[in-house]
Amino acid sequence: MPTKPDDVLPHPTSFVSTERLAQIKGYVLNERRTPARNLPVVTPHQTIGPFYPHHLVRPGDEDLAACDVGGPRAEGEPMEIVGTITDLSGKPVAGALIEVWTANAHGKYSHPADHSSQLIDPNFKGYGRAITGPSGTYRFVGIKPGAYPNPGYDNWMRPPHVHFSVYAAGVMHRLITQMYFPGESLNDIDPILNGIDDLAARASLIAVEEKSDTGRRYRFDIVLQGEAETQFFIER
């Protein structure tokens, strides 16, 4: 559906380089998308990472834990990720396309570029797509990812995390961030997460665990603009 002039969402005008990430092997160098406004709490940018899915992922494919519908499930702890995407006025954003990708329970990505010694799970797909409904909500099911060593760096284990990519009407670039899990000790020493100086902004990337009768459920809401705008990387 074409957008009207009033539907086009404003983009921030200031950018801050991310030189600290330039030295991280395997990560795409990006620039921060930083709002020019003063924000009370800012959810920080996160890098796209080296293992963006190389397969075609179909809209509606929200299950990361099985390669085929109804097929064998990947091993590990089942999880559900839910959330809402809103705009600058707090209005839900319908029709936004969300892509996610993550490692398996052993910390291995389903990607040919992952040459680590972590165990492969043949039933693990590890990526998916969803389109937000009229209320701006999305949902994924999968397996909680494991930690893994960052290639080329001694004693650096990346905490469990999920990569997010968001496309929405009126946004000229896809928006990239990462979701982390609460209660993970590696969160406290991860150079990427702790490269965010503002404590409140850093905490905004950690999902909130909710009660569920079917397993672990994590909430990760995304704000595209406004005073609580989520910050993202722009892929260069």
Which residues are covered by each model-predicted region?
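Beta-strand-dominated extracellular/periplasmic modules and repeats
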Residues: 2-236
